[in-house]
Amino acid sequence: MEGFFWKTLLVVGALTISGTSSFPHKPLTYEEAVDLAVSVYNSKSGEDSLYRLLEAVPALKWDALSESNQELNFSVKETVCQMAEERSLEECDFQEAGAVMGCTGYYFFGESPPVLVLTCKSVGNEEEQKQEEGNEEEKEVEKEEKEEDQKDQPKRVKRFKKFFKKLKNSVKKRAKKFFKKPKVIGVTFPF
């Protein structure tokens, strides 16, 4: 009978230990995860100004207890506070014409320690940029036409100059877009 007691005690102890849940990471709500991602962006981006949350896209499938990868999307805007000031973000107002960054973050909770990969890129108003570029091109073309009219050049030379000027402007635009790369930040942190 004594052997039966010890076997029963061993089984009950094993079930008790296996029944308790211990998470390898601290469960995060979506809001906490976004706040942490904004904090990581401010500390790792290398920007002079602090950025504050502008908008967080609600997560439909966020599971605070999940061990799988979790995605979050949000945008941040440049504030009047400088990084060196070490002020709370709540004290910092947005800059009037501050830069807006669209960010996508992925938490990898299955890793030990958990990993956050954050990708942010500028989301300035593309329509305004296109209009400004178009206005600049029109001004340049008008200026060139005036200069060409003043000179007595054959029409063929004028057409070539106009063509190569358009080509040059096109290359400039594409170079600007190419070198406007998003920032990618990866960090690990213990929970």
Swiss-Prot record:
InterPro entries: Cathelicidin-like, Cystatin_sf. Potent antimicrobial peptide against most of Gram-negative bacteria, some Gram-positive bacteria (Bacillus) and some fungi. Adopts an amphipathic alpha helical conformation, that may allow to partition into the target membrane. No hemolytic and cytotoxic activities have been observed on mammalian cells. Belongs to the cathelicidin family. It comes from Naja atra (Chinese cobra). Residues 1-22 form the signal peptide. One of its GO terms (cellular component) is membrane. PANTHER family: CATHELICIDIN, NEUTROPHILIC GRANULE PROTEIN. Residues 126-154 are annotated as: Disordered. Residues 23-161 form a propeptide. This is Cathelicidin-related antimicrobial peptide Na_CRAMP. Expressed by the venom gland. SUPFAM superfamilies: Cystatin/monellin (SSF54403).
